[in-house]
Structures are given as structure tokens and as C-alpha cells.
């Protein structure tokens, strides 16, 4: 569930409360499910210059994420699934777009900076106790285009890339360990359906292109406007 409020003509604030369902089946007798809220986020979006149709339209954004979902570092990993990241984080980014009627091209970049997750006491295999996690930073980039099939229907496609630095794990009565760096790529295919001059239903299917990306993701959004 997302809420967006226009503070000024070129400045808006938003919050997002995700509801997450996850399922994992390792064997016919070992199935795990989780249904809970995810990590709540608060953000802002600023457009310094009004679009004139000739030059690039630039927007800048930032957000703060609260670890309200089930932390992967506080659950029993053998019996439960997480619905959140487990740590506070902040991000900043930009987006650029331009209309080349009937094609609309866009791109974006971002940096993600998470804070450490400490005061942990999670038992891992071989009776190791996890006490702290220093997550890696992530850089993201996406490029795409949209095409208007008619006044009411459009389709879009984009490719998203991300690069994450190493995680560092701290163990009770042991030296720390690190995970490897990772890269991820996702192909997104979506559509927009205009149901009124101010309202468009959006759908998107994400297909993972690398082992570190989810196999498939699906999103569906319907905006609702409220005037205060």
C-alpha cells in the first residue's frame, strides 16, 4: 500500500507499506511460508524543472527504510522465512525521461546505503551464533522505453542492473566472515491502462537474468487520489 502527497507542485512525499507472501519448498516434507508486512519506507521526490517536451525531464529522489518486516537475522532459518531486510537503510537516486512521441524513453540510477544490524543472537548451522551483520552497499541502474499503442493502452520494457558490495558477518567467539560481491539483472515487461484522464492501472512482470535475481516478480498498482 503506497501513499503519496504533493507538498508542492514539484515536491512530493510518500510512504509505502508492503504486504509480503513468500513460499519455499525444499522437499515434499519441508515447506516454509510467510505472510506479513515488509519494510516500511518513507521517501521524497523533487522535480527541479518543469517538463517542456524538448529537453530531458530530471527527477531526484531519496528514501528511508524501517526494518518493520520479519528480519532474516532474527528468525529460525530452518522453519521460517523473512519478509524484510533486517536493517535500517537510506537511498538516493535520479531519473531522466524524454518523450519521443509515440515512444517514451527513461533511465535511472541509485545508491543504497544500509546500516549495520547489531545485537543479534541467531543460531546458525554448526551451532554458530550470529551477533552482527554489516551489509554491503548497492549501486543500481535501469534503462527502458515505453510505447503508446493507443490513448488508453501502453506497453513498456526495461532492464535493471545492480551491483552489491560484500556483506560482513560477525560471530560469537569467532572471527568475522564475508560474502562475495554480487551483480543482478532483471528484465521488466509491463503495461499501462488509462481508465480516466488522471488514473492509470499499471502491471509489471520481472524476469531474473542472473542467478542472484528472483526468477519472477509481478506487480500491480491502482492509484487513488484524495484531495485534502
Segments and roles (model prediction):
Residues 17-23, 48, 64-70, 98-102, ...:
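Transmembrane beta-strands of outer-membrane beta-barrel pores
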Residues 1-5, 15, 42-46, 62, ...:
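Residues on the lipid-exposed face of transmembrane beta-strands in outer-membrane beta-barrel proteins
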Residues 24-31, 70-78, 112, 117-126, ...:
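Outer-membrane beta-barrel translocator domains and adjoining extracellular loop/strand segments
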Residues 1, 34-40, 56, 84-90, ...:
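Residues that define the transmembrane beta-barrel architecture of outer-membrane proteins
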Amino acid at each position: 500500500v503506497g501513499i503519496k502527497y504533493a507538498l508542492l507542485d514539484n515536491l512530493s512525499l510518500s510512504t509505502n507499506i508492503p504486504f509480503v507472501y513468500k513460499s519455499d519448498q525444499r522437499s515434499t516434507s519441508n515447506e516454509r511460508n510467510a505472510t506479513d508486512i515488509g519494510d516500511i519506507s518513507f521517501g521524497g521526490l523533487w522535480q527541479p524543472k518543469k517538463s517542456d517536451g524538448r529537453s530531458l525531464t530530471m527527477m531526484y529522489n531519496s528514501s528511508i527504510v524501517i526494518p518493520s518486516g520479519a528480519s532474516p537475522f532474527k528468525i529460525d532459518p530452518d522453519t521460517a522465512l523473512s519478509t524484510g531486510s533486517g536493517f535500517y537503510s537510506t537511498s538516493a537516486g535520479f531519473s531522466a525521461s524524454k518523450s519521443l512521441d509515440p515512444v517514451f524513453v527513461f533511465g535511472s540510477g541509485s545508491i543504497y546505503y544500509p546500516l549495520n544490524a547489531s545485537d543479534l543472537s541467531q543460531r546458525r548451522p554448526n551451532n554458530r551464533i550470529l551477533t552482527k551483520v554489516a551489509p554491503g552497499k548497492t549501486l543500481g541502474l535501469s534503462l527502458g522505453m515505453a510505447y503508446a499503442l493507443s490513448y488508453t493502452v501502453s506497453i513498456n520494457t526495461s532492464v535493471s542492473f545492480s551491483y552489491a558490495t560484500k556483506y560482513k558477518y560477525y560471530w560469537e567467539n569467532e572471527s568475522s566472515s564475508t560474502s562475495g560481491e554480487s551483480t543482478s539483472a532483471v528484465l521488466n515487461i509491463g503495461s499501462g491502462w488509462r481508465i480516466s484522464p488522471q488514473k492509470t492501472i499499471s502491471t509489471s512482470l520481472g524476469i531474473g537474468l542472473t542467478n542472484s535475481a528472483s526468477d519472477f516478480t509481478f506487480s500491480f498498482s491502482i492509484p487513488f487520489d484524495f484531495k485534502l
